[in-house]
Amino acid sequence: MKNLQTHKATQSKGKNMEDVKALEQIDRLTSRFTRTCPSQPEYQERLAEEFEIILSLRFTDYFCQIRDILDLTQDIPHMTRGSAGSSLVCYLMGITDVNPIEWDIPVARFLNPKRDDLPDVDIDYPHYRQEEVMNRIFKKWPGKSARISNYVLYQDKSAKREAAKRLGHKGRLPRKFTYESLGIDPVEAKRIERKLKGKKKCISKHCGGILMFTRQLPKSLISQTNQILLDKNEVADLEHLKVDILSNRGLSQLIDIDPQIKLFEYPEIDEATSSLLSRGDVLGVTQGESPAMRRLFRAIRPQSMLDCVFATALIRPVAMQGRRKAAFFSDWTADRVSDVVVCEDDAIVQIAKLIGCDFYEADMYRRAFAKKNEEKVMEFMTRLGDHPRKDEVFRSLQELSGFGLCRAHAVNLGRLIWALAYQKAHNQKGFWSAALKHCHGSYKRWVYKTEAKRAGLTPTTISKSDKFDDPVWQYKKYGWWSDPKFLPGFYTRHLYLDRIEFAGLIANGRVYKAGNKKYVTFVTLGIDNGYYVDLTINKPFPYSDHDVIRGVGRIKHLNNSDYIEVIESEVLPIDKFYS
């Protein structure tokens, strides 16, 4: 099989037992194809390359098992995430809708003859049907399939709380407490803390990992809920296949809006969608609505679905590091694109180019950087020799230990965000009706309710009471209000030069720890219907238990986005703001 070129070419050579067995395996795969392989040389060569790897690593059963699961759930919409979209065989078998030839994705991230571990296939289903999919699998393969477990370990906070309980504290513990305030001996409590840290606290369910075994499992290993009482490390030596059956609220939202349009059927270019994304008008767009994504969309001004795909990869830590991010925004050129590690596949291509190896060996070095394998990293640096950009390359690849995306995953996620943005641009009511059901993002509840009201929807009626018409009372009790007007009294007022004073309702926030061990707090405030401002506060700021932030800052402008750099501020409960 060393010189395998195409399925047909191999058939003519099937004269010895090895070739006959290989042909049988290829026939098993091709019989499950749901698409016809194009005749162009790049497709035929890629197909031959993948067949050779699959057969040499004996992965035929795995691919057929994934196809069996999809056949079992063909009436349920799905979307494959992860690196499966790197494989032409996966595309032809209908496991993924990403064509790796069209998207120029090397297969090494998914299939690599230098590795003997199974490739990873993750399948997204609507979140409300995840359990149904799992139950179908358990029913189809009883005793041979089970959900994997996670061990929950004691960390700093949980160990501290457990120590307090073991030393006699009853009832709820404050979010921030000291042992002294509870009348507990701190020396003994800290001794218990140290003993607990890193120990098992309990067993939980994996978010979606399903194990498929070739033989019956001992009943002692399986719980009543079909959960194997082992974690991913403990099952490593057992003969099994693993597939992740995951839930995706964005997919649920899109299907709710229009179940007839497939994800890959949305137009790649649409002026209204591009305009919406360029304004950063992405509230309610699941997985694309964070403040960072809003700013990124304003910066790059997506003109197509391809740009949206690019943005989903660029926002990840691997691509969004300091100088490279700033340089990318200021130099939006093809040369700059090829010079930056945006997706993990870019690292493979870059490594192969730098040291003159094939993509498979390059992927092993990529994995070494991602897993912090110092011996393998040093081997790569030695092969790099006296390259003039050696230090820059090392810093760039070191960032692979952060959370990045392979290009195939970015394609699927970017297409989902583009499709949701398309629906928001063309079907506001349908979009917000689905968003209220499925979009559970990081914004406060009132944000989604307010945006839905602006789109013409009437959200669920608030229970009748003698204070029914008071929006502030409704906000305190329910987290939102029914009046179409915004809560009164919030403002931004220009003082002088770049100074501005503000008061707004907290919509979203997050505290980040920078590389210099300093903290920065990002907060989004609502000022009026459809009017939000972003704040940066150069310290950890206790916003989460309050409602309003009021203060003074400097107005800043960067990459088509305005924000306020806070000079002084105070955080208030809503009662105090109105008193």
Regions found by a protein language model. Give the residues of each.
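Low-complexity, intrinsically disordered or signal/transmembrane-proximal segments
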Residues: Q5-H7, Q11
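Noncatalytic, beta-rich nucleic-acid-contacting surfaces in large DNA/RNA-processing enzymes
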Residues: S12-S579
